[in-house]
From Swiss-Prot:
The protein, known as: Membrane protein insertase YidC
Family in the record: Belongs to the OXA1/ALB3/YidC family. Type 1 subfamily.
Cross-referenced Gene3D superfamilies: 2.70.98.90
Annotated membrane topology: Multi-pass membrane protein
Quaternary structure and interacting proteins, as annotated: Interacts with the Sec translocase complex via SecD. Specifically interacts with transmembrane segments of nascent integral membrane proteins during membrane integration.
Subcellular location: Cell membrane
Function: Required for the insertion and/or proper folding and/or complex formation of integral membrane proteins into the membrane. Involved in integration of membrane proteins that insert both dependently and independently of the Sec translocase complex, as well as at least some lipoproteins. Aids folding of multispanning membrane proteins.
Superkingdom of origin: Bacteria
GO molecular function terms attached to this record: membrane insertase activity
GO term, biological process aspect, one: protein insertion into membrane
Keywords tagged on the record: Cell membrane, Chaperone, Membrane, Protein transport, Transmembrane, Transmembrane helix, Transport
Cited InterPro entries: Membr_insert_YidC, Membr_insert_YidC_N, YidC/ALB3/OXA1/COX18, YidC/Oxa/ALB_C, YidC_ALB_C, YidC_periplasmic_sf
Transmembrane segments: 7-27, 336-356, 413-433, 450-470, 492-512
Species classification: Bacteria, Pseudomonadati, Pseudomonadota, Gammaproteobacteria, Enterobacterales
Amino acid sequence: MEVQRNFFIFAFLFVSFLLWQAWQSQMFLNKKTNEKIDPIFHFIDVKKNKKKIFIKNDVISLVVNMYGGDVEEASLLAYKDTLYSSRPFKLLETGSDFIYQAQSGLIGKDGPDSSINDSRPLYSANKNFFVLGPNEKELRVPIKWVSKNGVIYKKTFILKPNRYDVQIEYDVYNPSKESLNMNIFGQIKQTINLPKKRNVYSGNFALQTFRGAAYSSDDNKYEKYKFDMIANNKNLHIMTESGWIAMLQQYFAVAWIPDNLGKNTIYTSSLDHDTAVIGYKSPIINIPPNSRSIIKSKLWIGPEIQKEMKLVAPNLDLTVDYGWLWFLSQPLFKLLTILYSIIGNWGFSIILITFIMRGLTYPLTKAQYISMAKMRALQPKIQEIKEKFSKDKQRISQEMILLYKKEKINPLGGFLPIFIQMPIFLSLYYMLIGSVELRHAPFLLWIHDLSSQDPYYVLPVIMGLTMFFIQKISSTNHISDPLQKKIMNFMPVIFTAFFLWFPSGLVLYYIISNLVTIIQQKFILSNLEKNR
């Protein structure tokens, strides 16, 4: 009975945690504010449908608006929009009901991106389509604008094969007799409330992940910043020499990594309370008369592949959202990746990692069963104490403590494996919903995506049957309270219903873990019976 009760306590705690997490993520939706928006960034929100150019390497396809040179659309060619879609996943887009853009420019006293005149440079290019060839090591896409006083601005997008980072390079030539002062900025803008077509997991509390802004600075390696904070004008203003700014969602990220020109300013802003902005602004860059200056920054548009992000910028790989158990999820993911490199199937890798985890916790499991067996053996003595001192609860507690000390039993020993296994289980959950490598990863037969729910609910039903079997071999026949007995008998049905929406990979882990529990329980109890 103790095994069964502990098992359901574990499941209940996990589901309760997920429900709380889903509630927390929805708290900001109705919050509003009447505070004014910083006018410095008003011009960024002007919608100009000017000429566009198209840039493509083997993994990303970009659409750049020549009015300002912003990246208004980005498709990830190696990732499908949905499991059965032939369209690539569109990360950045500019539509009537949703905007997600990566913007950059030169602002300040002499910058062409003017907040005062509400205008931006209209660049030109020698063609509309730029594609990285099969044998080319680099694609350079220059766009050009010349100011009225003859200053030449050349903005170049640099793409490399099989890379999601894009180098943005400004080449500013100042032919005048006056110095020019300007700042480079890079920012990401996104509509806060998702349209229905993008909000695919809105009804699934088990697949909720962080969506919002994030940054890295001198003082913080990685810090999330919720959209509701930006919408309520609780804005950032951080001076830092290192770091980056980003917007995150499940599996994918867009990030600006500024060049180290001194103290950059990280900021956030809200446009009409429905659009969030996070960005950076460099210190003043001086361009002397009759000289040129090269100003660089880097843009990441792609999946959260940790080993690649780590090479692009320090701490950028931390954007993979493993929640508060990242210190467990990261080594688990590395182990899972090693297993996958050997087996070649993520599902079988999950099965194998389950055996490994349960093997490592076997000594605790064994200690749990031994502790429970001793507790059952003491039940007659415990009952005798309760009857003898029925009118003195304090005396009952004292006598029971003395009994536990005499028999060398820890009454809480049976709960220890729960507190060991629950973090492992939760970290695996975070890993499954946060690792892009598992997105659309097939297993066998009808399971084509281990990161999403079972479309036919077969795995949750099997999981429920294993819970029911654990309940039966633990036996509820000796429960005297009829209500408690009914509740315990109904628990497998309740948790089967909860697990209908869980990722298939997590349900698979739970099934295998339950089967291991059954085998271990039979083996340990059998040995205990023999040794009596």
